[in-house]
Amino acid sequence: MRKVTVIRPQKLHFPFSKGKILIDSIECETVKAGKSAEIEIPDGGHDIQVIFAAAPPVNSNMLRIEQSDGDTVFEVKIVVPLKNDPTYAELTKK
């Protein structure tokens, strides 16, 4: 497992400040603009999909992910599942 920091860029505006981000089935709190939250992801996790299980953002965009040591920085696309998509229901039930 690698610990990474999720950073929400200031330019992104989301209609909510609470919720969950599911990253390879690992949850972390949704990050407010300009703030960060640490999560752990499996090794080889560069194929991560970020899925908002709460209210989806207005526009899909990218989140910047960097390792806690600051060496590796990569971006992942936010995938917004449709609420009538069975995948959405599967991901959001806890």
Describe each region flagged by the PLM.
Residues M1-K94:
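Short loop/turn and low-complexity linker motifs enriched in small/turn-promoting residues
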